[in-house]
């Protein structure tokens, strides 16, 4: 048999499988929209958009009162933190620090910059090893606290604002609300199909986050001791994901994603402020306890908790502590 004939036969045999895969993608897989897939990643925070001292920056621009400002030559703390809080602490930096203290090479902050953005896991390592002086993050995970303890570092956590932990689905999903227990049952593997919680007959693809990330730490706390063991593959059906409200609404802002009500309450700013939404948590300015007497660190903390600092928190779409 000629080689060309063999190739043709192979292609004809493969064609039904190719058509089937295309059908599945168009009518099933594509509509799932992994909340942590490529679309979410492409819409992640772009550092350049929130740089201090930049006329086109999207940060909240407030000039700190004289008592809170640093001058060139002063001892100044290095600020770092979680990705979702970067626009907030970059605005703090812009308000307090002199021009020339932030070094950005077009892709990342340089080693000598007083402003850094290493994400949650990297920021906790930085505060422990001394390469950052104040970090802005959600509550640390048990592993992060143990890492600090193992290295002889005790941390001080100062609440500076409120945020909501939210659950999200593709906008085509008919489910608009889940209860706390339903979410826990889904992520512990007890509930496997959307039909069981008022949706259509489709497997639930429950997405998880990397261990050590702020959202995964929040999810572990939310599960209240139950192990996270989703029943289905992440490619099995309509997805359910979780994150913090600001990241989903303020950064991703995709029409394909919808936040769910929890116990019948939508995570609006008002419902977060009055604590009717079930999962409201603090985020913190965190520093080493041994640095408690450092005037530069206490100056930053005082500004963050001042009326101007809390204005930055509020206008950055978070909820102020005061």
Please provide the spans of the model-predicted regions:
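Exported/periplasmic ABC-transporter solute-binding proteins
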Residues: 2-163, 168-322
